[in-house]
Amino acid sequence: MATHVKTPDQLQESGTGLVHSLAKGLEILSCFSEGELLGNQQLVELTGLPKATVSRLTSTLVKLGYLQVDPRSRKLAMGARVLGLGVSVQRKLGLQRIARPHMEALSQRFGLTVTMGTRDRLSVVLLEVCRPPSLAQLVVNFDAGTHMPLSQTALGLASLVNSPVKDREQVIEGLRKQLGDQWVEARNRIERAHQEHERYGYIVSQRSLGRDVSGVAVGMVPMGSNTPYVFHMAGPSNQMPLSLMRSDMGPALKQMVQDIQAEMRAARPPKLVVPKEF
């Protein structure tokens, strides 16, 4: 199940132009990954919203086609309209289409899992996952739609470091409230990540999430977009010693991102210039 942060207090805050029922409906939709089944009680636990509110909103979302009912379990899944929205966004951006061949090549080269994601509030949601061909290497078993914590992985830290200053300040405040006693340790990781990014252009993590998994990550902001995306290569820590991440893996991932950016610029349609009238 996707990691999710309870934010009922945020949904109840009065803000200019905020439509609360819409915000709550979107909060429910954000709990789902593709193919995942959730019941109303699970959605109550994930969102912190009242049971009656969840029931009313899910019923509406089913009628509109944004959710659908699984006939066997009677639980809910993403509907065709949600999946269609995602396809439309990615077609417009074109990033995944261009990035995937580069990600597959890097995954095969190092025998590691390569992922692409973007920040979703206090986590990073994976958009694309490329695994190595050998089943023996499947230690990092994440799927598209998985949410990863911001402050505990190279993926999350790179996303945070590459975010606009205003967004970064809001996210850091959210993390401070969310993490409580663990905030000081997280803040130190964030500060080290900033220093590392300035020095190397990428961020590494060793044995993150309490597992024997390490990773290296690089962020990018596509032309014409304010949304930072992050590319991440991860695998067993014994295959990713720090010396190798510094000498080979980090620079290779950084070069891959530069190649993707160059290809996106080349694929960008020419700007129409209106001739001046004489």
Curated annotation (Swiss-Prot):
Domain IclR-ED: 95-266
A Pfam cross-reference name: HTH_IclR
Domain HTH iclR-type: residue ranges: 19-80
DNA-binding region, residue intervals: 40-59
Induction info: Induced by p-toluenesulfonate (TSA), p-toluenecarboxylate (TCA) and p-sulfobenzoate (PSB).
GO molecular function per UniProt: DNA binding; DNA-binding transcription factor activity
Keyword entries, A-Z: DNA-binding, Plasmid, Transcription, Transcription regulation
A Gene Ontology biological process term: negative regulation of DNA-templated transcription
Gene3D superfamilies: 3.30.450.40, Winged helix-like DNA-binding domain superfamily/Winged helix DNA-binding domain (1.10.10.10)
Gene knockout outcome: When both copies are inactivated, the mutants are unable to grow with TSA, but show normal growth with TCA. Growth with PSB is slightly faster than growth of the wild-type strain.
Function description: Both copies function as additional regulators for the tsa locus, specifically for tsaT.
PANTHER family named in the record: HELIX-TURN-HELIX TRANSCRIPTIONAL REGULATOR, ICLR FAMILY (PTHR30136), TRANSCRIPTIONAL REGULATORY PROTEIN (PTHR30136:SF33)
Protein name: HTH-type transcriptional regulator TsaQ1/TsaQ2
Taxonomic source organism: Comamonas testosteroni
